[in-house]
Amino acid sequence: MDFEAVIGLEVHAELSTNTKIYCGCTTEFGGQPNTHVCPICLGLPGSLPQLNKRVVEYGIKAGLALNCSINKVCRMDRKNYFYPDCPKNYQITQDEVPICRDGYIEIELENGEKKKIGIERIHMEEDAGKLLHTNAGTLVDYNRAGVPLIEIVSRPDIRTPEEATKYLEKLKSILSSIEVSDCKMEQGSLRCDGNISVMPKGSEKFGVRSEIKNMNSFKALEKALSYEYDRHVEAVTKGEILEQETRRWDEANSVTVLMRSKEKANDYRYFPEGDLVTLNISDEWIEEVRKTIPELPHEKAERFVNEFGIPKYDAMVLTLTMDMAKFFEETALKSEDAKAASNWLMGDISRLMNEKAIEVKDLKFNPEQLAQLIKLINAGTISNNIGKKVLDDMFKSGKNPKDIVEEKGLVQNNDEGAILEVVKNIIENNPQSIEDFKNGKKRALGFLVGLVMKETKGKANPQIVNKLVSEEANKM
């Protein structure tokens, strides 16, 4: 029997506000433990929350960008549970009347087809503190308690781990582009839980689901869902009874591990938050927020294809982050060579950033300098290979490419006469390569070209070298 997965994602995004959701404490990441706290976020007796208006604005903004309907009347609710990281023993969240409903994200599948993944709801809530486990015991840091979150709950429309990854990538790019969250997964400002079950292909009855936590990267998300899918299929095939449960992804052993049986909504005893009034959102406020939404990543990608003529794949990669998209667009305009700008950013520059674990905003050079490098190559002043060496230097020092070329004497040699002398000398000293070429071994020419480039320390124009080597070899 063939099975398919039924997957839904719950994504928590920390909002980029300066202060917490119900008090004036800073939301800055880090700091000494328990220094970004006050009686309100610690839940001390007599303290009363006051809703941060910017949190509501960001909730509306996210909803509009994700094609949601905005609930003009919504309220906050208490979610009751006892855990050391929750100082009040309840979390202020939204239950029956969230700020947003009924949205969607459109992803593109491997075959080029587009698929809509429904968004059931978006609700505002406060984050919990953080538990720090040591050999001596468990410590609690409440700096994160009260940091504003939105939780984005998808419908169970996802059918493969790959689709789940595409959904999360698209969601991340949208939230970061509208600047409601920095979406730094490594710092926990974007966290994802997955719900998965399996059912026979063609069936409409969902199986028993598991919730998976601790998926803090795209790679972890895909691996965890794949593992859990295989575990469910194996159990169902053997006739075993699956139970609804919460599991965590163990990255070190590439398995999911049981945490607890899955709670149901009534376990949390939701009821309205009496210390906060019902929230009324006017049409005028919604329209004000709508005007602040910039060009979204998929819109920008479509424009890049039409305006710059780059491939669709390039445009999608370049718009995953707005910093990369901006860097590309400025470079393309200044260099007048969009494809070269795309190639450098997606190739060597991305490789160097990955090696150093930095982002576009951390680069020491700017789009104008990259455009200058592209122009030097296009003008024949330096070769593409020399350009890569110049880029390495730019990456380390931030110097202008022209200055690097002049300081290191990297100007390309375009003198055919001088290059011809080197070519003749190389051919004369490598008769076996000429013999191989005559016997049909085309690679022999590549070997000779390599020797010429080595002799000229990479400064000879590769096009001229290829032409002269071919001409001279055919004369022999």
Swiss-Prot record:
Family that this chain belongs to: Belongs to the GatB/GatE family. GatB subfamily.
General function of this protein: Allows the formation of correctly charged Asn-tRNA(Asn) or Gln-tRNA(Gln) through the transamidation of misacylated Asp-tRNA(Asn) or Glu-tRNA(Gln) in organisms which lack either or both of asparaginyl-tRNA or glutaminyl-tRNA synthetases. The reaction takes place in the presence of glutamine and ATP through an activated phospho-Asp-tRNA(Asn) or phospho-Glu-tRNA(Gln).
Organismal lineage: Bacteria, Bacillati, Bacillota, Clostridia, Eubacteriales
Subunit structure: Heterotrimer of A, B and C subunits.
Keyword match Nuclease: no
InterPro entries membership: Asn/Gln-tRNA_amidoTrfase_suB/E, Asn/Gln-tRNA_Trfase_suB/E_cat, Asn/Gln_amidotransferase, Asn/Gln_tRNA_amidoTrase-B-like, GatB, GatB_C_1, GatB_Yqey_C_2, Gln-tRNA_amidoTrfase_suB_CS
Keywords, sorted A to Z: ATP-binding, Ligase, Nucleotide-binding, Protein biosynthesis
E.C. designation(s): 6.3.5.-
NCBIfam families, per the entry: gatB, PRK05477.1-2, PRK05477.1-4
Gene: gatB
GO molecular function: asparaginyl-tRNA synthase (glutamine-hydrolyzing) activity; ATP binding; glutaminyl-tRNA synthase (glutamine-hydrolyzing) activity
Enzyme type, top EC level: ligase
One of the GO biological process terms: translation
Protein name as annotated: Aspartyl/glutamyl-tRNA(Asn/Gln) amidotransferase subunit B
Catalytic activity field: L-glutamyl-tRNA(Gln) + L-glutamine + ATP + H2O = L-glutaminyl-tRNA(Gln) + L-glutamate + ADP + phosphate + H(+); L-aspartyl-tRNA(Asn) + L-glutamine + ATP + H2O = L-asparaginyl-tRNA(Asn) + L-glutamate + ADP + phosphate + 2 H(+)
HAMAP family named among the record's database cross-references: GatB
